[in-house]
Swiss-Prot record:
Main location: secreted
Single annotated GO MF: toxin activity
Name of the protein this chain belongs to: Conotoxin Fi3a
This protein's UniProt keywords: Disulfide bond, Hydroxylation, Neurotoxin, Secreted, Toxin
Keyword Disulfide bond annotated: yes
Function: May act as a neurotoxin.
Cellular component terms per the entry's GO annotation: extracellular region
Keyword Cell wall biogenesis/degradation on entry: no
Species per Swiss-Prot/TrEMBL record: Conus figulinus (Fig cone)
Residues bearing the modification 4-hydroxyproline: P11
Similarity comment: Belongs to the conotoxin M superfamily.
Length: 15
């Protein structure tokens, strides 16, 4: 999962 804010998503996009 990955939104505009990666830190909000866990786990975050590796790239």
């Amino acid at each position: 999962c990955c939104s505009q804010d990666c830190r909000v998503c866990i786990p975050c996009c590796p790239y």
